[in-house]
């Protein structure tokens, strides 16, 4: 199982390590835009992303937020725990920007009185649509308890 490619996405490749609970995550120099429609490479992107990711996960550890991160043996690699992937992206907004402006006709930069939490289905083919909790549960992408925990952690990290 060691060094067997388990998954490849737009930004990372996951390899088996011989331990079924641990994967090697290798960052890629590939860059994409438009849900993967535009592709190119950027020298050292993998090492920059790995370094930033490492610092974020180490900081989260100091806040007692559990993550999949174990260690970073190389400039573009991390050992991570094997986890169940929930295909949901959690976005917290303090100010209007991006898709929320287009969806609701809000001017960019408008501040919100309280952080807004939105959930999106991670699916490039569908352009990562906004999704409701009932749909997430009905489609078995996450349970109500998992959603509650995701939202709680998102607010802590925010």
Question: What kind of region is each of these model predictions?
Answer:
Residues 79-81, 101-158:
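ATP-dependent phospho-/nucleotidyl transfer catalytic cores
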